[in-house]
Structures are given as structure tokens and as C-alpha cells.
């Protein structure tokens, strides 16, 4: 392993461990060095089920806002005085803890704060609950081992399979699945990794990324980790050859590791939606109304420019309604 890269990882780890946060949940940042290597395992490719590709309406189709101002969930939130949102704490640019202030910040966070503003009148009327990728759906369905939340804003791709369990807002960001490799790598895309053979590619458990690796790219060995941060640690110590992830996530990794680069054209489109419980459609309609306002008055653009502007010019995705 590159000695300079080792030093970079050590410095990042030290900065992380120096911070104590006030949010609830299992902070992903704490797993950067404390999680044993055994938590990353080859994915069970033989038993993985391919994602559903045929669904009507489409995965990006949500419920149209109708001007509704109340629902069971909205009443609970207002009585509580705070919107509980499931987030990441280690996805730089999207949702990560600032090592200097201890606060969680990023694109997803600012979008969630605007939803809190719409419900409670203040973007600060919000509680961030740190969850892993695998806890995103259980946190909305009452699944075992996941803290309950009203909303998930954690780079959650809208899929037909997930619609069978939860509900989504309209699409609020369109990401693309890419690969991160060492700066010295000659690979230009995943086909080069497949051709090289014996290449390990890391992705978090319970993600569309891991499923895609297992089912569409048998020429690489998919390695499952609990979090994106664990994938980064495995990559930096030389245990895996690449990380697969959304371009937003990988851009944050490159900002942390100058000895890494993102390669290739997007392997897929990853539309992000805010996750909500499936049994309160009026809450979904309300959130979609809030997103309409965020798009229309320029707040979405300001949030994008602040956090993701280096990825290039972008406009908010057009909402699709019809459920």
C-alpha cells in the first residue's frame, strides 16, 4: 500500500475521531477504523435476485401535490416539534459530519432542512438520525434494529422494488453510478476491470449498486461493506481495487483522497427520492408540494451550487406524477 495514502487515511481518521456529535443513531464515521475487516465480505452472487425492471407506474412516478396541509404524520411531527430524518454522516458533499463544527451538512441535509421549514416554519426544527444504507427502509417500516424516522434523505435511489415497501417523493436529484480507482490505474471503465480478472469492487450492503455489481458484472468480485466509509478504508489499505458508487458519493471520496480518481461513463442512472412510509400518501403529497416550491424559487439551485457545483451545471429533475 502507498505510504502516503496510509498517512492520508490516518489523518482523516484522526480528524473523525476528534469529533463528538449530537445526532442520534449509529454514526458511520465511527466505523472508519473501528469496524473489523471481517465486516466486508464477498457478496453472495449465486443467490442475489435481479432488481425488478418492469413496473407501472415508473419508479420515478410519485403522488401529485394537491395542496393538502394535514396528515397523520404531519400531525405527529407538529406535536413533536421536530422532523426526524434518517441521514448519513459520512457521505461528503451529500451528508457528512463537519469535523470542525460537529454538525452534519451537505446537499441531502439542506434539502431535508427545507422540508422541515415547510412543515414547522424553521429549517432548524429537525432531528438527524444517523442510519446505515441497510437501515434506510427498515427505519420507515418499523424494521428491527432501525431507529424510526419520518423521512429518509440518504442518497436513496427510487426503484420499483422499494416502492413495494415504502413511498418516495418526486425525484430531487439524478445521480449516475460510476467507479473509483487508484490514480495509477490504467482502467477506463468496469470492462477493463473485468478483463484484468481478480478485481474486487466494494459497495455497501442493501444498495442498488451492490445488486448491479452482482447481477450485471460477473467479471469482478463484489465486496459488501456496511458503509461507504468502510469501502473507502478498504480501498485505501489496498484490500479492494475499486469502489462503485453514485458520482455524488465518489466526488466526496476524491476530495478526501488525491490518489484516487473516478473513471468511465455512468453505468446507470440513480434517481434520488426522499423515502417515507407507504401508509400516509397525504404526507408524500405535502412533501412533493414543498419540493415544487424549492425548485421554483431557486432554493434547489442554490443548494446544488453550494455542494455539488463542481460536478458541473445542473437543473432540478422534472417531477413525474401519476400514482
What are these regions (language model features)?
Residues 173-181, 247, 251-290, 310-323:
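Periplasmic-binding protein-like
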Residues 23-26:
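Bacterial signal peptide processing site
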Residues 32-151:
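Extracytoplasmic small-molecule ligand-binding "clamshell" domains
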Residues 40-68, 207, 274-311:
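Extended ligand-binding regions for polar small-molecule ligands
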Residues 16-21:
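C-terminal motif of bacterial Sec signal peptides marking the signal peptidase cleavage site
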Residues 104-119, 156-159, 174-232, 242, ...:
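Bilobed "Venus flytrap"/periplasmic-binding protein-like clamshell domains
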Residues 124, 142-156, 199-200, 237-246, ...:
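Alpha-to-beta junction loops
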Amino acid at each position: 500500500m502507498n505510504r502516503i495514502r496510509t498517512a492520508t487515511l490516518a489523518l482523516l481518521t484522526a480528524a473523525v475521531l476528534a469529533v463528538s456529535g449530537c445526532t442520534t443513531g449509529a454514526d458511520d464515521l465511527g466505523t472508519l477504523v473501528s469496524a473489523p475487516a471481517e465486516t466486508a465480505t464477498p457478496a453472495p452472487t449465486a443467490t442475489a435476485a435481479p432488481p425488478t425492471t418492469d413496473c407501472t407506474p415508473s419508479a420515478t412516478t410519485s403522488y401529485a401535490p394537491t395542496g393538502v396541509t394535514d396528515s397523520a404524520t404531519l400531525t405527529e411531527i407538529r406535536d413533536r416539534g421536530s422532523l426526524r430524518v434518517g441521514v448519513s454522516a459520512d457521505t461528503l458533499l451529500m451528508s457528512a459530519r463537519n469535523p470542525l463544527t460537529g454538525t452534519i451538512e451537505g446537499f441531502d441535509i439542506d434539502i431535508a432542512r427545507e422540508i422541515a421549514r415547510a412543515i414547522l416554519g424553521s429549517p432548524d426544527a429537525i432531528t438527524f438520525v444517523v442510519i446505515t444504507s441497510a437501515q434506510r427502509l427498515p427505519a420507515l417500516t418499523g424494521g428491527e434494529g432501525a431507529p424510526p424516522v419520518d423521512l429518509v434523505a440518504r442518497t436513496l435511489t427510487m426503484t420499483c422494488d422499494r416502492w413495494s415497501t415504502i413511498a418516495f417523493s418526486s425525484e430531487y436529484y439524478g445521480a449516475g453510478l460510476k467507479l473509483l480507482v487508484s490514480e495509477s490505474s490504467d482502467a477506463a471503465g468496469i470492462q477493463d476491470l473485468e478483463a484484468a480478472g481478480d478485481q474486487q469492487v466494494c459497495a455497501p450492503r442493501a444498495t442498488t449498486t451492490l445488486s448491479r455489481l452482482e447481477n450485471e458484472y460477473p467479471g469482478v468480485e463484489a465486496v459488501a461493506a456496511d458503509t461507504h466509509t468502510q469501502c473507502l478504508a478498504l480501498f485505501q489499505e489496498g484490500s479492494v481495487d475499486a469502489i462503485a458508487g453514485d458520482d455524488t458519493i465518489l466526488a466526496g471520496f476524491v476530495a478526501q483522497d488525491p490518489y484516487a480518481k473516478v473513471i468511465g461513463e455512468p453505468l446507470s442512472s440513480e434517481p434520488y427520492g426522499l423515502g417515507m412510509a407507504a401508509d400516509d400518501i397525504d404526507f408524500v403529497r405535502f412533501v412533493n408540494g414543498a419540493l415544487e416550491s424549492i425548485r421554483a424559487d431557486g432554493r434547489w439551485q442554490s443548494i446544488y451550487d453550494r455542494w455539488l457545483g463542481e460536478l458541473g451545471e445542473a437543473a432540478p429533475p422534472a417531477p413525474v406524477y401519476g400514482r
